[in-house]
Amino acid sequence: MRFIFFLSFPLYLLDRATKYLVLGHIKPDGPRVVVPNFFHLVNITNTGAAFGSFKNNNAFFIGISCIALLFALVLLLGQSKSGKAASLWWTRDIWRDVSLALLLAGVLGNLTDRLLYGHVIDFLLFDLHVPFAHPWPAFNVADACICIAVVCFIIHSFRQEKRVTEAAQL
Protein backbone atom coordinates (compact mmCIF):
# COMPACT_ATOMS: atom_id res chain seq x y z
CA MET A 1 0.00 0.00 0.00
CA ARG A 2 2.86 2.39 0.74
CA PHE A 3 4.28 1.73 -2.71
CA ILE A 4 1.01 2.80 -4.27
CA PHE A 5 0.88 5.99 -2.20
CA PHE A 6 4.51 6.81 -3.01
CA LEU A 7 3.77 6.45 -6.72
CA SER A 8 0.31 8.07 -6.80
CA PHE A 9 0.94 11.10 -4.63
CA PRO A 10 4.00 12.50 -6.48
CA LEU A 11 2.27 11.98 -9.84
CA TYR A 12 -0.83 13.76 -8.54
CA LEU A 13 1.38 16.63 -7.31
CA LEU A 14 3.17 16.74 -10.68
CA ASP A 15 -0.20 17.01 -12.43
CA ARG A 16 -1.32 19.82 -10.11
CA ALA A 17 2.00 21.69 -10.40
CA THR A 18 2.13 21.52 -14.19
CA LYS A 19 -1.46 22.74 -14.50
CA TYR A 20 -0.73 25.56 -12.06
CA LEU A 21 2.25 26.61 -14.19
CA VAL A 22 0.20 26.43 -17.38
CA LEU A 23 -2.56 28.59 -15.90
CA GLY A 24 -0.01 31.15 -14.75
CA HIS A 25 2.23 31.29 -17.80
CA ILE A 26 0.38 30.21 -20.95
CA LYS A 27 -2.55 32.17 -22.32
CA PRO A 28 -5.39 30.22 -23.95
CA ASP A 29 -4.65 31.88 -27.28
CA GLY A 30 -0.85 31.73 -27.02
CA PRO A 31 0.74 28.30 -27.44
CA ARG A 32 4.41 27.94 -26.58
CA VAL A 33 6.46 26.11 -29.19
CA VAL A 34 8.84 23.63 -27.57
CA VAL A 35 9.83 21.59 -30.65
CA PRO A 36 8.71 23.24 -33.92
CA ASN A 37 6.15 21.23 -35.90
CA PHE A 38 6.04 18.57 -33.18
CA PHE A 39 5.43 19.69 -29.56
CA HIS A 40 3.67 22.72 -28.07
CA LEU A 41 2.54 23.74 -24.60
CA VAL A 42 -1.01 25.05 -24.74
CA ASN A 43 -3.78 26.06 -22.34
CA ILE A 44 -6.94 24.24 -23.39
CA THR A 45 -10.07 23.68 -21.34
CA ASN A 46 -11.74 20.31 -21.81
CA THR A 47 -15.31 19.89 -20.56
CA GLY A 48 -15.51 16.36 -21.92
CA ALA A 49 -13.55 13.14 -21.75
CA ALA A 50 -10.74 11.73 -23.88
CA PHE A 51 -10.17 13.69 -27.08
CA GLY A 52 -12.82 16.19 -25.98
CA SER A 53 -15.65 13.68 -26.45
CA PHE A 54 -18.95 14.08 -24.57
CA LYS A 55 -18.45 17.80 -23.96
CA ASN A 56 -20.26 19.73 -21.23
CA ASN A 57 -21.00 16.74 -18.99
CA ASN A 58 -19.01 17.83 -15.95
CA ALA A 59 -21.41 16.40 -13.34
CA PHE A 60 -21.44 13.04 -15.14
CA PHE A 61 -17.63 12.89 -15.23
CA ILE A 62 -17.39 13.89 -11.57
CA GLY A 63 -19.65 10.92 -10.78
CA ILE A 64 -17.67 8.54 -13.00
CA SER A 65 -14.42 9.75 -11.40
CA CYS A 66 -15.77 9.11 -7.91
CA ILE A 67 -16.85 5.60 -8.93
CA ALA A 68 -13.41 4.94 -10.45
CA LEU A 69 -11.68 6.14 -7.27
CA LEU A 70 -13.92 3.97 -5.12
CA PHE A 71 -13.31 0.97 -7.39
CA ALA A 72 -9.53 1.42 -7.21
CA LEU A 73 -9.59 1.84 -3.43
CA VAL A 74 -11.72 -1.28 -2.97
CA LEU A 75 -9.24 -3.25 -5.06
CA LEU A 76 -6.30 -1.87 -3.13
CA LEU A 77 -7.75 -2.36 0.32
CA GLY A 78 -9.97 -5.38 -0.19
CA GLN A 79 -9.44 -9.06 -0.62
CA SER A 80 -11.65 -11.98 -1.55
CA LYS A 81 -13.52 -13.56 1.38
CA SER A 82 -11.39 -16.71 1.27
CA GLY A 83 -8.20 -14.65 1.42
CA LYS A 84 -7.17 -16.05 -1.96
CA ALA A 85 -7.27 -14.31 -5.28
CA ALA A 86 -10.73 -14.99 -6.66
CA SER A 87 -10.32 -13.25 -9.98
CA LEU A 88 -8.08 -11.15 -12.15
CA TRP A 89 -9.08 -8.02 -10.23
CA TRP A 90 -8.02 -9.37 -6.85
CA THR A 91 -4.78 -11.03 -7.95
CA ARG A 92 -2.00 -8.79 -6.72
CA ASP A 93 1.19 -8.28 -8.65
CA ILE A 94 3.37 -5.31 -9.49
CA TRP A 95 1.53 -4.59 -12.76
CA ARG A 96 -1.86 -4.45 -11.06
CA ASP A 97 -0.56 -2.28 -8.24
CA VAL A 98 1.21 0.12 -10.63
CA SER A 99 -1.93 0.34 -12.77
CA LEU A 100 -4.07 1.16 -9.73
CA ALA A 101 -1.55 3.73 -8.45
CA LEU A 102 -1.48 5.45 -11.85
CA LEU A 103 -5.27 5.27 -12.08
CA LEU A 104 -5.63 6.92 -8.67
CA ALA A 105 -3.22 9.72 -9.60
CA GLY A 106 -4.86 10.35 -12.96
CA VAL A 107 -8.46 10.21 -11.87
CA LEU A 108 -7.80 12.34 -8.80
CA GLY A 109 -5.89 14.91 -10.89
CA ASN A 110 -8.69 15.36 -13.41
CA LEU A 111 -11.37 15.20 -10.70
CA THR A 112 -9.63 18.04 -8.86
CA ASP A 113 -9.77 20.13 -12.06
CA ARG A 114 -13.45 19.40 -12.56
CA LEU A 115 -14.26 20.36 -8.97
CA LEU A 116 -12.10 23.52 -8.96
CA TYR A 117 -12.67 24.84 -12.48
CA GLY A 118 -15.61 22.94 -14.00
CA HIS A 119 -13.33 21.52 -16.69
CA VAL A 120 -10.00 19.75 -17.16
CA ILE A 121 -6.88 21.68 -18.14
CA ASP A 122 -4.99 20.08 -21.04
CA PHE A 123 -1.62 21.45 -22.07
CA LEU A 124 0.57 18.89 -23.87
CA LEU A 125 0.05 19.08 -27.62
CA PHE A 126 1.93 16.80 -30.01
CA ASP A 127 1.69 16.91 -33.77
CA LEU A 128 2.39 13.34 -34.84
CA HIS A 129 1.75 14.14 -38.51
CA VAL A 130 -0.73 11.32 -38.95
CA PRO A 131 -3.89 11.88 -41.01
CA PHE A 132 -6.39 10.73 -38.37
CA ALA A 133 -4.98 12.93 -35.59
CA HIS A 134 -3.38 16.09 -36.85
CA PRO A 135 -2.50 17.37 -34.29
CA TRP A 136 -2.98 14.75 -31.60
CA PRO A 137 -5.51 16.05 -29.05
CA ALA A 138 -4.01 17.94 -26.12
CA PHE A 139 -3.71 16.05 -22.84
CA ASN A 140 -2.17 16.40 -19.38
CA VAL A 141 -0.15 14.41 -16.83
CA ALA A 142 -3.31 12.89 -15.32
CA ASP A 143 -4.46 11.68 -18.75
CA ALA A 144 -1.05 10.10 -19.35
CA CYS A 145 -1.28 8.33 -15.97
CA ILE A 146 -4.69 6.90 -16.87
CA CYS A 147 -3.49 5.67 -20.29
CA ILE A 148 -0.38 4.05 -18.82
CA ALA A 149 -2.58 2.49 -16.10
CA VAL A 150 -4.66 0.80 -18.79
CA VAL A 151 -1.52 -0.59 -20.46
CA CYS A 152 -0.22 -1.88 -17.11
CA PHE A 153 -3.54 -3.55 -16.34
CA ILE A 154 -3.56 -5.23 -19.77
CA ILE A 155 -0.08 -6.58 -19.02
CA HIS A 156 -1.35 -7.74 -15.62
CA SER A 157 -4.29 -9.54 -17.24
CA PHE A 158 -2.08 -11.33 -19.78
CA ARG A 159 0.29 -12.42 -17.03
CA GLN A 160 -2.62 -13.79 -15.01
CA GLU A 161 -4.03 -15.59 -18.05
CA LYS A 162 -0.64 -17.21 -18.60
CA ARG A 163 -0.51 -18.34 -14.95
CA VAL A 164 -4.00 -19.85 -15.17
CA THR A 165 -3.09 -21.67 -18.39
CA GLU A 166 0.14 -23.02 -16.89
CA ALA A 167 -1.68 -24.17 -13.74
CA ALA A 168 -4.32 -25.96 -15.82
CA GLN A 169 -1.62 -27.85 -17.75
CA LEU A 170 -0.08 -29.27 -14.56
Which role does the model predict for each range below?
Residues M1-L170:
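Alpha-helical transmembrane bundles and membrane-interface segments of multipass inner-membrane proteins
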